[in-house]
């Protein structure tokens, strides 16, 4: 049984993502937060979804799920894995590592996609923190912007708190 099959059994939402990917050949919930630069997405479940992502212009991926994507899927792109449990938030060091990864990739004209399982909680947290550091938004404004562009984003109080703490950490 492969990694994604194990995750499908352990997390029912992953069954939907796997079926969606087989039919649509693209991950769930993909959208650009910053046009052609920074995107959020649900978890890719096949190499054909990775191919679709690359065709959108993405050149770097951050995975926010407990398990990384298979190495064979990401061997030709810049990749960062920040293991974070569902509905929780990464710590300040992990957030800053992800935000700096995004900024460094964008400086090299390498569009970035951040994903978790559904592409809303952990993904939204990192996207909001990027907006705080590099778009100079307040925590509240960053959360509002991410939620406007990606409805349902930032799912838990701990994620909202982490975004607020990151803002304070920087200021």
Residue ranges of predicted features:
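Cys-dependent protein tyrosine phosphatase-like superfamily
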Residues: 1-112, 128-171
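Short cysteine clusters
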Residues: 116
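Conserved G/P- and acidic residue-centered "switch" motifs that form tight phosphate/ATP-binding loops
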Residues: 119
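Ser/Thr-glycine-rich phosphate-binding loops at phosphate-binding pockets of nucleotides
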Residues: 123
């Amino acid at each position: 049984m492969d990694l994604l099959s194990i995750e499908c059994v352990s997390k029912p939402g992953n069954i939907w993502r796997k079926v969606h990917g087989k039919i649509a050949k693209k991950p769930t919930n993909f959208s650009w937060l910053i046009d052609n630069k920074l995107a959020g997405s649900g978890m890719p479940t096949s190499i054909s979804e990775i191919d679709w992502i690359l065709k959108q212009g993405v050149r770097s991926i951050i995975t926010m799920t407990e398990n990384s994507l298979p190495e064979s899927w990401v061997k030709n792109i810049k990749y960062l894995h920040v293991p974070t449990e569902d509905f929780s938030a990464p710590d300040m060091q992990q957030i800053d590592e992800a935000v700096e990864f995004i900024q460094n990739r964008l400086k090299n004209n390498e569009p970035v996609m951040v994903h978790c399982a559904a592409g809303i909680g952990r993904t939204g947290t990192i996207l909001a923190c990027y907006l705080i550091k590099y778009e100079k938004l307040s925590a509240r404004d960053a959360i509002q912007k991410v939620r406007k562009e990606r409805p349902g984003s930032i799912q838990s109080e701990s994620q909202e708190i982490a975004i607020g703490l990151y803002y304070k950490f920087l200021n």
